[in-house]
């Protein structure tokens, strides 16, 4: 696709857009000045870019009908394996549909990408296949991942296996629902505000948001570079540890992972937690929307840790209450600029840029923007409003405040091995009807991140484990650890899991 020299009319229009007053002679001179840089673009078109590596042979699979998609959790079903032997031999894994699998359609929950088929595997997919895992399919997710509930996916509502009238959570709702329904033992999710932990909590499964920079997101569609995470969801703590072992570590592309420090996650499963100290985060229990019954289930689970030799005491981190405000300043403008205006791949980062995804996203933005969910429209318009009127000031300030938020948690974690709180202050909400008012559809998609989103900003690992039922719906306990200390969280999670059937707590 050669880059054409703009006409003098186009250059005049470009200048006017920036408030430039250009004479006819200046416009003509700028047209000539364009020729040198555009010659470089011409050469770029000729050069052959590297790819992510060879792709194993496979069938593209199929889109399942209602009979084999009871909860709407599948977008596409496959049976991809290489015959390799490793830590995931015999395991079936669902892949969140914001992660590329070569030859398999990908929507990322959005009409914008309908019909797109990537030609490459994301790093995490390659690692799963090399470890002997079988890719069972793509798990449905929320529209461009801009929802913490499960009613904005373009392929249909994703339902909670514990009560199909209730949300599975989001944005990795399909991943958690498939694990909860027993269709796969493990799945991959993404997390920018709680999108691994929310559905894991609401569906009663185990979900880990790793330390920022531990797991490469190469080949995954981003939202905002500074809060993007990819991590495991499993039916057990062992499933989470097993999958994390395979996907963690630098991949040569994602520069966020250069400093990644991996641990022996499988060995951590057998290490008793006796002697560890945990801080019970006061602010995590005190939101206006906190359900006392949820708080009680979480405190009972914490008591079971005491029986395993873990010391606990209450701790206060006042910054936790301002964390969601810092997160909002980062994610809203960041997503609008990087994802929506960056055509699904963003810019100014060191990493792999999937050109085919970028082109597909640009086509969708040009032809199907009115088909996106209300949450996507909100992010697009609000981000642009802040950009035009406040010139990125609040995004920049939020990025600076990130340091203070991180330090506040780190100060508490100097004394404690982990911080504990409810994952979500309440159980899964009812799925709004298709004709729900716009405000209801948006509010129920975005009202649950009070405890989760701050740790996307601070980058600390956060592990949710099921710890009880309230009116038949699961409750999650979230444990937050030091950077790259996922092993301690696995030790604590194993102790809670071993304490007995969480459904009877």
Regions found by a protein language model. Give the residues of each.
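Amidase signature
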Residues: 1-88, 246-453, 457, 484, ...
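Gly/Ser-rich catalytic/binding loops embedded in alpha/beta enzyme cores
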Residues: 21-192, 274, 299, 303, ...
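Short, well-ordered beta-strand elements within core beta-sheets of diverse protein domains
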Residues: 19-21, 75-76, 92-94, 112-117, ...
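Flexible loop/turn segments at secondary-structure boundaries
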Residues: 102, 142-145, 194-197, 229, ...
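Short glycine-enriched, charge-decorated loop/helix-capping segments at active-site entrances
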Residues: 108-114, 435-440, 479
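Short low-complexity, flexible loop/linker segments enriched in glycine and/or proline
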Residues: 150-154, 201-204, 326-332, 435-437, ...
